[in-house]
Design a protein with these regions (language model features):
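Active-site nucleophile loop of the alpha/beta-hydrolase fold
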Residues: 112-122
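Short alpha-helix in the alpha/beta-hydrolase fold that links the catalytic acid
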Residues: 34, 182, 196-205
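Gly/Ala-rich beta-loop-alpha elbow adjacent to hydrolase catalytic centers
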Residues: 91-95, 99
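Short beta-strand/loop motif that positions the catalytic acidic residue
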Residues: 180, 186-188, 192
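Catalytic histidine neighborhood in serine/cysteine hydrolases
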Residues: 201, 205-223
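Catalytic nucleophile-loop/oxyanion-hole region of alpha/beta-hydrolase
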Residues: 56-84
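Conserved alpha/beta-hydrolase
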Residues: 39-57
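Catalytic active-site module of serine/aspartate enzymes centered on a nucleophile-bearing elbow/loop
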Residues: 219-248
């Protein structure tokens, strides 16, 4: 059974634009509900789909953070080319790391990093995450358990250069967070087991913006956009965006 591939999306809402960035091994569906909510509130939202994501896992390991960063940057320029002068960005996990990187690379109206890591717990945790993604993908293709196991054995032999590169990107962004002057709203799920949640405090403390907030979601885990407090999250992000000094 072929799995329907998630695609980039653009929801035309109004003159204010928000770039939405998904996480590592995730896809644009991770930020789709948030995009729909913001569209209803008058924001135009665009979410790119990173190369090697939402496709068979064998393709993921042949791409890397440089490709994904380029996809994020292209998403920003996509909105610019559509005539949007002021762009805010919200990103989940690795998308949150990229949202911070955009904050010191190009003009950004406001930044919402959600469960964004500033250091990796361990390569092992990330490696397990990739294996879980691979297994889940293969199961959803309707393959038998035997077939999935056989393919997983092969998959485990694939060199994972991606993980080292990912760590390097995260640590590079961490070293530059103090170059961010755009208003920032740091979002973190209290029950996040995927990253070290101290990352949220690091971002909040090191961002130089005079306008910054942090909120801990007590009932949520890592993929906070799908978790039980998502409605509250949508409202909080909207409230933050409304406070920005838009020129329209």
């Amino acid at each position: 059974m072929k799995i329907a591939q998630p695609k980039p999306f653009t929801f035309e809402g109004g003159k204010r634009a928000v770039l939405l960035l998904h996480g590592f091994t995730g896809n644009s569906a991770d930020v789709r509900m948030l995009g729909r909510y913001l569209e209803k509130e008058g924001y135009t939202c665009h979410a790119p789909q990173y190369k090697g994501h939402g496709v068979p896992p064998e393709e993921l390991v042949h791409t890397g953070p440089e490709d994904w960063w380029q996809d994020a940057l292209n998403g920003y320029h996509f909105l610019k080319n559509r005539g949007f002068e002021e762009i805010a960005v919200a990103g989940l996990s690795l998308g949150g790391v990229f949202s911070l990187k955009l904050g010191y690379t190009v003009p950004i109206k406001g930044i919402v990093p959600m469960c964004a890591p500033m250091y990796i717990k361990s390569e092992e945790v990330m490696y397990q995450g990739i294996l879980e993604y691979a297994r889940d993908y293969k199961s959803r293709e309707g393959k038998s358990e035997e077939q999935v196991e056989m393919e997983m054995e092969q998959f485990k032999k694939t060199p994972m250069k991606t993980l080292k590169a990912l760590q390097a990107v995260i640590s590079d962004v961490r070293n530059h967070v103090d170059l961010i002057y755009a208003p920032t709203f740091v979002v973190q799920g209290r029950h996040d087991k995927m990253i070290n949640t101290e990352s949220a405090n690091i971002i909040y403390n090191e961002v130089e913006s005079p306008i910054k907030e942090i909120k801990w979601y007590e009932e949520s885990g890592h993929v906070i956009t799908f978790d039980k407090e998502r409605d509250q999250l949508h409202e909080d992000i909207y409230r933050f965006l409304e406070k920005l000094d838009w020129q329209d």
